[in-house]
A protein has these predicted regions:
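Membrane-interface extramembranous regions at the lipid-water interface
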Residues: 24, 34, 40-121, 138-171, ...
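Hydrophobic alpha-helical transmembrane segments
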Residues: 120-136, 243-255
C-alpha cells in the first residue's frame, strides 16, 4: 500500500532533523554535533546517530587540528624576518652613505671607489636575497596558519561565523577590499578563538588594531620604495630613494613585531579551546 503524501513528508522531515542526535566520541568522550562523522577533537570515526543518517546530505566537515606546531614555526619565521629587515636597514644606510661619498668625491682613487662599490653590492645582494626568501616563506606559512585557525573555529561548531577559511585568506589578494576585509576576518578569528561559544560579545586587544595599522602603513611605504627604486638611475635619484628604503625596512620590523604578538595570542586561545570540554561549546 502506498504511503500518503503527509506520511512521506513526516518521514523526510524526521531524516533531516528530528532523528539526528548529538553523540559522544567512543574514544575520547567529547560531545559532537549530529552532522559530524569524525570527532572534532581526536578525529576518530563516530558511529551513526541513527539509521536516517545515511540518507541525509553530507555537509562539508572539518576536524580540529592543533595549530601549536604551525604557530611555533610562524613565530620563528617572523623573528627571522625582523632580524633580516633590521640588518637590511643597516645595510641600506651603509649604501646610502657610500652613494653620498661617491657624489662628494670622497674616494682617493677610482680603484678604491670600485672596490667599495663591489663590496657593497655583494653584501647588499646577499642580505636582499635572504630577506626575499624569508618574506616569501612567511607569506605562505601565514596564509596556511590563517586557514588552519579559521578552519578550527568551524570544526568547533562556533556559531555565526561570517568568514570561511578560504576567504579569511583570500581577502588579502582582493584589491581595495584587502584594506579592511582581512582585518575583519582576523577580528572574528581573535574573538571566536577566545570564546567559541559566545564570541560576539568578546572584545579585541588594541594589539590587533595596531598590527593592522602598521601592516597598511608598511605595505604603502614598501610599494612606494619599490617604485622609486625601479625608476632610480642617476646617482642623485639613488641617494633620494635611500631614506625611503630604510623607512620601509623599519616599518616592516614594527609590523612583524605586532604580527608576532597576534599570532602568538590567537595560537594560545586555540590551544585553550582545544583543551576545554567541547560539550560546553555545543551546549
Amino acid at each position: 500500500m502506498l504511503a500518503s503524501p503527509g506520511a512521506l513528508w513526516q518521514d523526510c522531515s524526521g531524516v533531516q532533523s528530528g532523528e539526528l542526535q548529538a553523540m559522544n566520541c567512543p574514544q575520547c568522550g567529547v560531545l559532537n554535533e549530529p552532522a559530524n562523522v569524525t570527532c572534532v577533537r581526536c578525529g576518530a570515526a563516530l558511529p551513526a546517530a541513527s539509521s536516517a543518517r545515511g540518507a541525509a546530505a553530507m555537509p562539508v566537515r572539518r576536524v580540529f587540528r592543533d595549530p601549536k606546531r604551525l604557530t611555533k614555526w610562524l613565530i620563528w619565521l617572523l623573528v627571522a624576518g625582523i632580524v633580516c629587515d633590521a640588518v637590511f636597514a643597516i645595510s641600506e644606510l651603509a649604501q646610502h652613505q657610500l652613494l653620498i661619498r661617491m657624489r662628494d668625491g670622497g674616494f682617493a682613487s677610482e680603484l678604491e671607489l670600485m672596490s667599495a662599490a663591489e663590496a657593497n653590492d655583494l653584501r647588499h645582494g646577499i642580505i636582499g636575497i635572504a630577506v626575499m626568501l624569508v618574506v616569501i616563506t612567511t607569506i605562505v606559512l601565514f596564509a596556511v596558519w590563517i586557514h588552519r585557525v579559521s578552519s578550527n573555529l568551524h570544526a568547533l561548531g562556533t556559531p555565526g561565523l561570517r568568514f570561511t577559511p578560504g576567504w579569511a585568506v583570500g581577502w588579502y589578494f582582493v584589491p581595495i577590499a584587502n584594506l579592511w576585509k582581512p582585518f575583519q576576518a582576523m577580528k572574528e578569528i581573535w574573538r571566536a578563538s577566545k570564546n567559541p561559544g559566545a564570541w560576539q560579545s568578546e572584545t579585541i586587544s588594541p594589539v590587533l588594531g595596531w598590527w593592522w595599522f602598521w601592516w597598511i602603513v608598511s605595505s604603502i611605504v614598501s610599494n612606494v620604495s619599490l617604485r622609486m627604486s625601479l625608476r632610480a638611475e642617476a646617482l642623485d635619484e639613488l641617494i633620494s630613494v635611500g631614506p625611503v628604503n630604510i623607512a620601509s625596512s623599519v616599518l616592516d620590523v614594527i609590523s612583524a613585531i605586532f604580527a608576532l604578538l597576534v599570532v602568538k595570542k590567537i595560537g594560545s586561545f586555540q590551544a585553550m579551546a582545544a583543551d576545554r570540554s567541547l560539550g560546553a561549546v555545543f551546549a
